[in-house]
Amino acid sequence: MQIFVEKIENPSQEFWIWKKEITNRQTGGIYPSAISNVGSGISAAIYQKDEAGHVTQIAQLQLPDYEKLVEYYSAGKEINLNYIYIDDFAWLGDELPYEVESLPYTEREGFSARCALLNNHGEPAYFHIMQSKLKKGDMDFSYSGFFNLNLDLCNLSVEQGNLVFDFARFDHSNISVGMIACGGNPYFSPEISFSYIKADTVKIDTMLMSQSLSLDFLCAKTSNTTISLDPLPTTFKEICFVKAAANTVTITNAEIDTVDIREAHIDSLAFKRCKFLEYAEIGGHIQELHIDDCINAAVWKLSVPQAQTLTLSGTINTGRICFTDFVSAIPPLTAASSSDPAQLLMLKENFRQTGEYENEDICHLYFQRSKTKCERNRLKKAGRYMLDGISGYGTKPFRMLLVILAVIVLFGTLYYCAPFLSFHGASTWLEHIYASGITFFAVGYGDLFPLNTITKMVSLTEAFLGVTSTSYFLVLLSRKVIR
């Protein structure tokens, strides 16, 4: 994609970006009406050429007066870049970001660039506003466009506002935000807002935050984009990805009060070494969800029916985890449990505390199956497989009832068919089934009894199986009923 600029006559000083409704001449008060205070008075039509060769006008903006811009920036005056097209960033200085980190803060009256277009068409360029203290207003980039640019906003203090990128567009750019302090405003608490942005082939990073802020990606639409959020050493107040679309979102080393990710379309969402403090709701079309090595002291509500991967490896839960549809979460959870069965044990204890006993049994069953797969002693492994088969490791009592009936029928048929086994008073198959039943349950009416030693030994074996099997069945059944 290429950007072309053509100077035009514009006596009415009407400017717009993306569509003609986003203009300084609108009457609804939604878009900024004030134009730049560092403009040159020269207007330009901005065209975009796509890969197919189609050329479309995307904006009509003013070109800046770079000498005036340098003067204002150096003196810390208020800079308004509304409806400005910028493709030269020398006015920011030639220092690299790491070279200005040790410099003292520069006090600035204000800085905004709403409905602006910042395009780098040459060597890699940095748009870095660093080591600055803004006295009034938001640092606002709403509706602006960033093309082929490295945007660095670090060591900033926005004393009476927030950092805002609402409705901005990013293309082949890197955004790095760190050490930001926002004072908020009467309408919003301190936050960094990327609401309704559009991004293609972009990387967004936050790191080394100096204040507990909220991050808002409401309805953000991105492709080929990676979002990495790390607030260390501070916390995030709230993280919002409601109705957002993203490829990869990774949140690390964060203490988070509230997480709101509803109706989102995210290929891979990962929380690593995070601590959840109050409430977290995660739902939508999320292909991979990783919550690893985290501490949950909050209430989670998870609704990820289409997740192909779901891991809770190394996570400690002291809060509550609620699944809207746990059945759909079983396949990805059990696939991940082969490497860390303890996550199923953690969920089992969670469901026991919340009274979701069916889900508790499911977790117990798959946890025990994972342990069986890891068992190296063949004899123990065979015993565990048998326990799974007859009762699902204690979670399926009616399977045990079928086993009891099958054993009675098996011994009755053996008594009937084996010539060396005989009972007094039994001649037909049903009578031998009856003999097997009273032996199994140790009833002992006295109407039937074994006639030889071999029959007595076999009956003794069946009686032992009957006592143990019946006791086991009653324990499993009472556990189900009492709960």
Q: Which residues does each PLM region occupy?
A:
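N-terminal leader/targeting and pre-domain segments
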Residues: 2-381
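Generic alpha-helical structural element
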Residues: 336, 349-352, 399, 403, ...
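Alpha-helix capping/termination and helix-coil
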Residues: 355, 371, 409, 418-421, ...
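Hydrophobic, well-ordered secondary-structure elements that form the walls
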Residues: 360, 414, 477
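Generic, well-ordered alpha-helical scaffold segments in large soluble proteins
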Residues: 366, 413, 417, 464-467, ...
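Core alpha-helical transmembrane segments of integral membrane proteins
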Residues: 380-449
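Pore domain of cation channels
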Residues: 423-483
